[in-house]
Amino acid sequence: MKKLALALDVNDINQALEIVDEIQDKIIIKIGYNLFIKGGINFVKQIKDRGFDIFLDLKLHDIPNTVYNGVKAVSEIGVNYLTIHSLGGQEMIQQAVKAKEGTDLKILAVTILTSHDENYPKLLGSSLSVPDLAYRLADMAVSNGSDGIVCSSHEVKFLKEHIQKPFIAVVPGIRLTKEKTDDQTRIATPEEALRDGADIIVVGRPILKAEDRNKIIKEMLSVIEEL
């Protein structure tokens, strides 16, 4: 399993394709709903045809039948990973899992976004801490058939230690240093996330804004190999 995903968070389809064409190593490409809305299935296939695994980050969160139909449609276009939101509940997750039966699509349930801080559970009317809420959501998702979860590096070690069923842990908010420079509040370096149990790390701006993107990618792949 590839362990490095590039968050292709740009606004222009042509720019996105230029970046992908520049990349030498066949890593995972994460496509958010901005590019997916603009480029559609054809854009996904263009990336797929270049030899990359596709991580479609749509965070589906709707009534179970609607999510079932959405996942079914995604499963037919050769996507490797698709996100749903764990807050959608057990039945929604079960329907998402059912919809991709017979395919290689992996369902990843988002727990708590890395932009949220410790006040987030209170906004939901919960007295739980962020780690406890993340655990409740992750355990529920994995127990109902989700192949993996998306969580911050702050929770991944605890989740790996306490959720009994094996699962893929995807950790976004990866930065080259711990200095906070953007809207992500719960960040980690590649080394920290991987040591704590991340199976896939998602990196966006540190690669996209680099003068030499391939250099940064190779450095991260080297860290992955060492760990």
Swiss-Prot record:
GO terms for cellular component: cytosol. It catalyses: orotidine 5'-phosphate + H(+) = UMP + CO2. Keywords: Decarboxylase, Lyase, Pyrimidine biosynthesis. Its EC number is 4.1.1.23. Pfam families: OMPdecase. It is an enzyme of class 4 (lyase). Substrate binds at residues 9, 30, 57-66, 114, 175, 184, 204-205. GO terms for molecular function: orotidine-5'-phosphate decarboxylase activity. The active site is at K59 (proton donor). SUPFAM superfamilies: Ribulose-phoshate binding barrel (SSF51366). Pathway: Pyrimidine metabolism; UMP biosynthesis via de novo pathway; UMP from orotate: step 2/2. GO terms for biological process: 'de novo' pyrimidine nucleobase biosynthetic process; 'de novo' UMP biosynthetic process. Belongs to the OMP decarboxylase family. Type 1 subfamily. PANTHER family: OROTIDINE 5'-PHOSPHATE DECARBOXYLASE. Homodimer. Catalyzes the decarboxylation of orotidine 5'-monophosphate (OMP) to uridine 5'-monophosphate (UMP). This is Orotidine 5'-phosphate decarboxylase.
